């Protein structure tokens, strides 16, 4: 078998050098084997440095892996990915989901949407250019994915042959974290105080210059930002830094005498790669360079400590370059606090969340991935490690305490628990075989089975200055006392923000601070993780909510390092702004270093709530008000108690404490944190409060203070200052303050007793060092973080204000200045009555709540007014001081504070107003109202007056110092409900119409104290129209200088009551409207007590809506059903119809012409038969009618040169879904309602015309249309298809059809109306439609989802009669529930049901048409007046009304045939009708010309109309006036429009013996105004997504009036027939005789003359041609033009 056909063996290269039987080989043989494998690997890797893949550009690393990775990605041979048969093309990948929390969620992506790794590299590289420092909302980070993704991206490109697998890739260390080198990425390790002492191996760092990859990796390191807190787990035997050419046991004397406890089995199943030998030279050179740098660092540490200077970014980068270069291979075992949802799993762990474990189990949380045989050996080692840990705990505990204290590392807040000491791991030479994940900075050597100090391990932070690296070097050097001193120097002497306690790898142990968090240090939230977070610690990104949040905090932290030091920004700016952390009152900042299940207590301790004076740390008082370092010095129990009970006592520092008002308070020494930590409690991935900005806050929360070893410092350490009030806002440090000494202070007392904090030494004012250049995007990100935090703070503040604001009690509809709104016209007394009831309920709730609270805690002691006033002032001063110390609260104005004990009361007091102060009990009189108007529960004591002073005093006579008139009461929204100022409308002129003589109160009256009502001394107060009548307190506080006499108020009240009654009588809506008084009026009872009855003209939104349509004089239907309903359209009983059909039926070619061919149509059953002639036996075509067929609307189409023809199409319509917009969707698109596919979709109709019929007789054709519609309605159909639509849609069409006769007087008769319901549905699957109508049988019994209710004013219920249903409708369901349920056929416009209604008899006509023909001798005038009535439509829930117009109006006035020629004119193409001139009647035409006499009088127009167009239409034999719409847009209803047609008959014109009696009026209205039918709901059941179904309802009312024509003979056409008194002389003139033609047919013989008559042949009249063939020899004889004959005898129409 060819090697190409075999599966690729990633271990083939190194297996060639491996012994066959590994269990029998000695350690030397294994070492030789490994060296051979390393040599093999090096030979592969040394072929040339590859180009750095774009995916390794750390600028683009966000700490978030976009997909998981496995070993298959690392091999060279790339094969097509196998599709999981279960998942198909949709595979699950980890994706970063944007949004608060940025939690990782599994998204299902189709294969086509998944990017390849090459695509990832390019895209991410481009992205990295603009987002170098990733500062995004906090999110948990899975480091295994990050490492794997980067490693695979690199390995795939450079690996030419398989290399040996191992735990870490070369690039993993570098690419692991964005920002591991670049100083601009200011990431701070979570545990700034965590320390693990490490000693660098004796051999110097090697192979930096000589190594072939050195330049490559140096350049690569330059690109990589500082990697804060790497989470790589050391899972390999070694790293390039430990790839010694000789046996490691021989080279490292520390392990010389130690033998591995068990044989090391090579991890053959490892999925990870490492190049064993390619880094040996680099190791040597790097270690050598590192040692040199360590010396420099040590020398510079003292310098840094004295000058308090931060080393330049350049030097930082250089140091970090070298260290990171050595570091990037090693994945040191990290002790981290990982959130349960994103536990630390080493570099390449599975992404399986682990629950938080106890300290002993925390080891397994970070286990690296081992092969099976390796894992067994590892378990054995772990067992020994655990035993050794237990044995050495107590010993190390003591040693650790001494060591830490001697080094100046006082473990604050700890009680020297074993976890603290062991976790600190600062004992020299500690070599316990601990869990690989437990010791950052250590590497597990699998040859020696020992821990080796990892010289490549670098604290994951950004700009760590030289002092930081000195401490690092010291920490990694041989762990002796000197190293400890160096660490101390770095930490205490020169601790500027640049130091960051860099290499105290103490990662706050959850044992020390989190395990017993309630007792000590209260979670980093109390203070710890921020201030004490050691940048070198493995960061718990969960505390930040993610790596990005961590970066943000670190960057902010580092920026602070560039500030003139902590003292300058003191707890406000440095801590709030520069750390990217806004002191937000609502944020519970989870600490970075150690978190625990007790973090909630810490949260209370570290709640940046400026209003809480009992917070433990970082409140608005900054560091002055409270030594936040005290949490470190105190015992765990004591510290918890301190946070809860102490109120920023400054007892923690004495010497430098009080000067700290100008200088920053002391920064506590970072407590040593044990290595074993517990995972923090599960953070809310979307909670910005706990893990969102907490990440920023912890590092930012408190800048690490530099601890002075001066005697002052030590003395202050031993003593505590007395408590004093909160200090003023801290100022910048003064220049003359003492410099920081590098010497270690005297050893403080053990931490068994909480020692006082170290006062901060005076920091010299040093020149501000230039901040490291930061990418603009990073700055923007950080600023965005600040802004978002500020926004959160503002939102919380606004939320509190919203809850407590008196504006809540101002009803929007009560602003009567804007006339309108549902409450705009409510009587004042009515409004007050409503509000009184509402506020009583509110007070009941408030009292229940208060009683409930009082049951839980002791009742608040009653205080005297003076005492409470003093407490208010003191609290306000305290709040002002607290605000003054916070830079972010510079613009904050302290609210009116009350003591903390009563903080629960504040919202209630804010809400207490005239309404809410009413006790929850009913009152029967105004006396009770005034006596009990307050209850005095909520009145602030400074407003409460003595109860004994009840002497009456007229309004306006109050003394200036009256509490009622004092400033708090005048503009106090806490104790009064805001009112509008007195207005001209008189809203405030009457307190109560029923309170004509109110109880007058003295200036010192407590308005809530019951008083005796004296009727003779009652005075009416200015009324608050928004408050209930009972609240007299508020009324007195407004307009106190307006004194209104009682008589005036009573008179005004009575006048307003009468006006309200009059308005109520006069204001009747035209159509089914609600009665709304135009003004807010008092109760008509005048001075009577408040009536519990509803007063006259009562109007509110709570009125029973169903009465709206019943109390109007116009009912919705005629209730008299004694007479049976007649057929709406009489049944057709003829044999068939003489019609015309368009021939040929199917067009043969595009250019072919078709003509109208006479035919005869019969209907038998559902079959339509088409004959050439009525006498034919065989039809020329048969057509079976189906339910999917439909008839078009009847239209007019050109027929010949004289006129048009009525046509109708029998068609089959197919709908196709395509992109487009139909008229109904435009408004929805404007509102943003777009389909789920992002494009507007319409279902366009594609019509297939089966037959097209025409007729010159409109009524004849209408009978045919009606008959066919009846047949289609009875056709049966079922839903068979189950289509799939991108956009589902349901259309319901409701057609009202109405006909009536109107006589000359305008009286309606012979009304008929019916309703037809059509449906057109495009629904996926086989759903069921349920249509609910306003059937009165269904009133009050509707059960329908809210989403299915259609937005119509539907409080109208009508009676259905003569119901007919389509066969598809579930008839029993309708009989039971009155719901039309059916499964609609797909894409079929069909009629669901039809029913009859009885229109009311006295209803106003929608359009009034009056037609008159005046005949004055030979002069004739046709006069038509049209006027549209006001049809009002109102939307439910609002008072908005709009007129419903009449549209497509056609008024047809019949013209005798003898006069037709008068309306015709010859044109160049034939004969046409004379069109009307649009002239408004009553205007003088050509006035200017007439005055000048320049032009003769113009010829009179034949037809003049004010609107629309009029002309003679031969198909109707009528003068047709067409109007598009009445009333016109922006025009009012009831406006009369006139058409005049004047002509004079000649001597040849005949006068008809009789005229047609009526004219026709047709029009439509866009709502169902005839029947008032309303589709209340459309429900789609059994549908996959009924919420996405678009629903449309179209209402059309089709009216047809037969209006009687008034024929009048008069003396003059200008005579006003309606009012003859206008021109009595003309009216009295004799009426001339009727016109007589010159040739009288009655006297002439028929042979001589014949009257004018147009003869139509049989075909023209709708009959069949005499010849079937169009091409006949006798064609010249056939008359194409009608013949005009004269027949005077039988003249008629």
Swiss-Prot record:
A motif (DPF 2) lies at residues 1006-1008. Residues 1-12, 279-301, 311-322, 393-412, 899-913 have a biased composition (Basic and acidic residues). Residues 596-615, 786-807, 1073-1095, 1637-1651 have a biased composition (Polar residues). One of its GO terms (biological process) is clathrin-dependent endocytosis. A motif (DPF 1) lies at residues 684-686. Residues 1287-1606 form the MHD domain. A motif (DPF 4) lies at residues 1039-1041. Residues 26-39, 632-643, 708-722 have a biased composition (Low complexity). InterPro entries: Adaptor_comp_med_subunit, AP2_Mu_C_sf, MHD, SHD_dom. GO terms for molecular function: clathrin adaptor activity. It is found in: Cytoplasm. Its main location: cytoplasm. Keywords: Cytoplasm, Endocytosis, Repeat. Pfam families: Adap_comp_sub. Residues 1136-1283 form the SHD domain. Residues 360-371 have a biased composition (Acidic residues). The Asp-Pro-Phe (DPF) motifs, which are found in many presynatic proteins, are thought to mediate an interaction with Alpha-adaptin. Belongs to the Stoned B family. This is Putative stoned B-like protein. It comes from Caenorhabditis elegans. The lineage of its organism: Eukaryota, Metazoa, Ecdysozoa, Nematoda, Chromadorea.
């Amino acid at each position: 078998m060819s090697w190409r056909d075999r599966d690729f063996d990633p271990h083939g290269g190194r297996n060639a050098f491996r012994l066959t039987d590994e269990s029998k080989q000695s350690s030397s043989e294994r070492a030789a084997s490994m060296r051979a494998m390393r040599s093999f690997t090096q030979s592969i890797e040394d072929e040339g440095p590859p180009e750095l893949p774009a995916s390794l550009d750390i600028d683009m690393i966000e700490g978030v892996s976009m997909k998981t990775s496995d070993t298959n990605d690392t091999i060279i041979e790339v094969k097509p990915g196998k599709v999981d048969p279960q998942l198909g093309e949709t595979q699950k990948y980890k994706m970063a989901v944007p949004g608060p929390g940025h939690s990782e969620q599994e998204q299902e992506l189709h294969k086509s949407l998944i990017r390849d790794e090459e695509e990832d590299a390019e895209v991410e590289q481009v992205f990295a250019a603009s987002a170098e420092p990733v500062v995004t909302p906090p999110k948990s980070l899975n480091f295994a994915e990050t490492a794997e993704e980067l490693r695979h991206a690199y390995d795939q490109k450079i690996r030419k042959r398989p290399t040996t697998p191992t735990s870490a890739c070369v690039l993993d260390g570098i690419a692991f974290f964005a920002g591991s080198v670049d100083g601009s990425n200011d990431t701070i390790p979570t545990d700034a105080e965590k320390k693990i002492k490490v000693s660098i191996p004796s051999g110097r760092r090697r192979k930096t210059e000589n190594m072939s990859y050195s330049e490559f990796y140096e350049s690569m390191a330059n690109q990589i930002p500082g990697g804060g807190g790497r989470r790589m787990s050391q899972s390999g035997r070694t790293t390039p830094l430990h790839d010694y050419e000789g046996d490691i046991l021989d080279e490292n004397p520390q392990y010389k005498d130690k033998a591995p406890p068990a044989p090391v089995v090579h991890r053959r199943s490892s999925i990870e790669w490492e190049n064993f030998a390619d880094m040996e030279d680099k190791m040597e050179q790097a270690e050598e360079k590192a040692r040199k740098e360590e010396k420099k660092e040590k020398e510079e540490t003292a310098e840094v400590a004295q000058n308090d200077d931060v080393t330049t970014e350049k030097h930082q980068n250089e140091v970090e370059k070298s260290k990171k270069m050595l570091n990037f291979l090693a994945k040191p075992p990290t002790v981290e606090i990982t959130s349960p949802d994103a536990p630390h799993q080493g570099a390449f762990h599975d992404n399986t969340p682990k629950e938080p474990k106890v300290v002993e189990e925390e080891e397994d949380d970070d286990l690296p991935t081992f092969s099976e045989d390796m894992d067994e050996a590892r378990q054995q080692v772990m067992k020994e490690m655990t035993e050794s840990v237990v044995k050495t705990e107590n010993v190390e505990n003591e040693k650790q305490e001494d060591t830490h204290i001697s080094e100046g590392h006082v473990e604050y807040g700890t009680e020297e628990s074993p976890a603290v000491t062991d976790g600190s791991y600062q004992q020299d030479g500690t070599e316990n075989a601990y869990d690989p994940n437990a010791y950052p900075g250590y590497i597990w050597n699998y040859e020696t089975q020992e821990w080796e100090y990892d010289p490549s391990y670098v604290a994951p932070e950004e700009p760590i200055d030289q002092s930081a690296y000195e401490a690092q070097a010291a920490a990694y050097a041989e762990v002796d006392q000197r190293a400890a001193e160096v660490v101390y120097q770095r930490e205490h002497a020169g601790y500027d923000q640049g130091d960051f306690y860099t290499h105290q790898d103490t990662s706050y142990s959850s044992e020390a601070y989190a395990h017993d968090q309630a007792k000590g240090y209260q979670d980093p939230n109390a203070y710890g993780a921020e201030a004490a977070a050691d940048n070198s610690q493995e960061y718990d990104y969960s505390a930040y909510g993610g790596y990005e949040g961590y970066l943000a905090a670190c960057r902010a932290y580092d920026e602070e390092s560039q500030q003139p030091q902590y003292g300058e920004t003191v707890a406000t700016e440095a801590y709030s702004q520069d750390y990217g952390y806004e002191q937000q009152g609502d944020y519970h900042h989870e600490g970075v270093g150690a978190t625990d299940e007790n973090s909630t207590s810490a949260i209370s301790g570290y709640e940046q709530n400026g209003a809480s004076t009992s917070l433990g740390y970082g409140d608005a008082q900054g560091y002055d008000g409270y030594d936040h370092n005290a949490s470190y010095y105190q015992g765990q129990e004591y510290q918890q108690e301190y946070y809860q009970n102490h109120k920023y006592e400054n007892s923690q520092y004495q010497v430098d404490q009080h000067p700290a008002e100008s200088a920053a308070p002391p920064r506590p020494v970072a407590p040593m944190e044990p290595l074993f930590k517990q995972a923090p409690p599960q953070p809310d991935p979307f909670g910005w409060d706990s893990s969102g900005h907490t990440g920023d806050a912890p590092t930012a929360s408190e800048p690490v203070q530099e601890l002075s070893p001066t005697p002052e410092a030590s003395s202050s350490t031993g003593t505590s200052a007395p408590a004093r009030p909160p200090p003023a806002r801290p100022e910048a440090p003064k220049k003359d303050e003492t410099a920081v000494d590098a010497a270690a202070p005297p050893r403080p007392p053990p931490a068994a007793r909480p020692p006082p904090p170290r006062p901060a030494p005076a920091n010299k004012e040093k020149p501000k060092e230039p901040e490291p250049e930061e990418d603009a995007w990073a700055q923007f990100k950080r600023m965005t973080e600040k802004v978002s935090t500020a926004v959160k703070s503002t939102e919380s503040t606004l939320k509190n204000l919203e809850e407590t604001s008196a504006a809540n009690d101002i009803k929007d509809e009560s602003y009567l200045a804007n006339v309108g709104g549902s409450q705009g016209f409510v009587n004042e007394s009515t409004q007050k009555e409503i509000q009184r009831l509402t506020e009583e309920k509110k007070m009941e709730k408030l009292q229940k709540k208060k009683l409930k609270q009082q049951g839980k805690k002791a009742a608040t002691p009653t205080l005297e007014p003076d005492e409470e006033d003093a407490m208010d002032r003191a609290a306000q001063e305290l709040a002002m001081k607290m605000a003054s110390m916070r830079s972010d609260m510079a613009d904050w104005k302290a609210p009116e504070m009350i003591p903390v004990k009563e903080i629960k009361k504040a919202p209630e007091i804010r809400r207490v107003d005239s309404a809410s102060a009413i006790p929850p009990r009913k009152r029967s009189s105004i006396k009770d109202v005034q006596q009990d108007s307050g209850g005095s529960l909520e009145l602030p004591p400074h407003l409460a007056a003595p109860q004994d002073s009840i002497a009456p005093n007229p309004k306006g006579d109050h003394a200036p110092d009256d509490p009622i008139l004092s400033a708090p009461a005048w503009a106090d929204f806490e104790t009064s409900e805001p009112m509008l100022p007195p207005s001209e409308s008189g809203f405030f002129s009457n307190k109560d119409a029923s309170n004509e003589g109110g109880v007058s109160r003295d200036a010192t009256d407590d308005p809530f104290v019951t008083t005796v009502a004296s009727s003779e001394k009652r005075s009416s107060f200015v009324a608050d129209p928004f408050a209930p009548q009972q609240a007299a307190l508020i009324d007195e506080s407004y307009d106190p200088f307006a004194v209104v006499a009682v008589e005036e108020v009573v008179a005004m009240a009575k006048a307003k009551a009468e006006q309200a009654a009059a308005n109520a009588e006069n204001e009747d809506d035209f159509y089914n409207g609600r009665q709304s008084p135009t003004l807010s009026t008092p109760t008509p009872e005048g001075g009577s007590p408040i009536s519990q009855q509803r007063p006259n003209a009562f109007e509110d939104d709570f009125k029973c809506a169903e009465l709206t349509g019943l109390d109007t004089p116009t009912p919705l239907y005629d209730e008299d059903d004694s007479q049976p309903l007649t057929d709406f359209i009489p049944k057709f009983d003829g044999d068939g119809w003489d019609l015309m059909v368009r021939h040929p039926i199917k067009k043969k070619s595009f250019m072919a012409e078709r003509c109208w061919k006479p035919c005869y149509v019969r209907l038998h059953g559902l079959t339509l038969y088409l004959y050439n002639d009525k006498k034919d036996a065989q039809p020329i075509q048969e057509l079976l009618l189906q339910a999917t067929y439909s008839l078009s609307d009847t239209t007019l189409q050109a027929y010949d040169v004289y006129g048009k023809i009525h046509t109708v199409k029998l068609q089959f319509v197919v709908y196709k879904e395509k992109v487009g917009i139909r008229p109904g969707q435009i408004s929805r698109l404007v509102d943003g309602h777009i389909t789920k596919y992002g494009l507007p979709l319409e279902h366009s109709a594609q019509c297939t015309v089966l037959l097209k019929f025409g007729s010159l007789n409109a009524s004849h054709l209408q009978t045919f249309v009606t008959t066919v519609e009846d047949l289609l309605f009875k056709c049966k159909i079922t839903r068979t298809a189950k289509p799939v639509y991108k956009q589902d849609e349901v259309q319901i069409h409701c057609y009202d059809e109405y006909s009536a006769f109107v006589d000359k007087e305008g009286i309606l008769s012979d009304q008929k109306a019916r309703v037809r319901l059509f449906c057109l549905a495009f629904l996926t699957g086989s759903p069921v439609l349920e249509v609910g109508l306003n059937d009165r049988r269904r009133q009050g019994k509707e059960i329908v989802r809210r989403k299915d209710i259609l937005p119509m004013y539907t409080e109208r219920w009508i009676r259905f009669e003569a119901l007919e249903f389509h066969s598809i409708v579930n008839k029993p369901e309708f009989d039971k529930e009155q719901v039309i349920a059916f499964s609609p056929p797909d894409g079929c416009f069909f009629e669901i049901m039809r029913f009859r209604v009885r229109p009311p008899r006295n209803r106003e006509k929608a359009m009034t048409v009056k037609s008159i023909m005046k005949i004055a001798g030979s002069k004739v005038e046709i006069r038509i007046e049209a006027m549209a009535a006001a049809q009002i439509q109102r939307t439910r829930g609002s008072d908005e009304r709009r007129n419903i117009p009449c549209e497509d109006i056609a008024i047809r006035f019949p013209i005798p045939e003898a006069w037709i020629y008068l309306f015709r004119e010859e044109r160049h193409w034939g004969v046409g009708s004379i069109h009307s001139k649009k002239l408004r009647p009553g205007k003088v035409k050509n006035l200017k010309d007439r005055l000048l006499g320049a032009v003769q009088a113009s010829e009179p127009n034949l037809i003049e109309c004010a609107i629309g167009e009029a002309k003679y239409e031969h198909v109707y034999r009528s003068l047709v006036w067409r109007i598009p719409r009445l009333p016109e847009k922006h025009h009012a209803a009831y406006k009369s429009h006139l058409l005049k047609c004047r002509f004079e008959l000649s001597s040849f014109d005949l006068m008809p013996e009789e005229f047609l009696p009526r004219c026709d009026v047709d029009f439509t209205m866009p709502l169902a105004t005839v029947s008032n039918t309303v589709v209340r709901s459309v429900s789609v059941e059994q549908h996959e997504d009924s919420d996405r179904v678009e629903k449309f309802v179209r209402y059309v009312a089709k009216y047809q009036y037969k209006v009687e024509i008034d024929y009048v003979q008069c003396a003059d056409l200008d005579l006003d027939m309606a009012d003859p008194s206008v021109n009595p002389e003309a009216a009295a003139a004799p009426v001339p005789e009727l016109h007589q033609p010159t040739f009288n047919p009655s006297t002439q013989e028929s042979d001589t003359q014949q009257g004018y008559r147009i003869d139509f042949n049989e075909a023209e009249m709708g009959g069949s041609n005499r010849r079937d063939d169009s091409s006949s020899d006798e064609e010249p004889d056939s008359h194409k033009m009608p013949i005009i004959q004269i027949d005077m005898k039988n003249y008629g129409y």
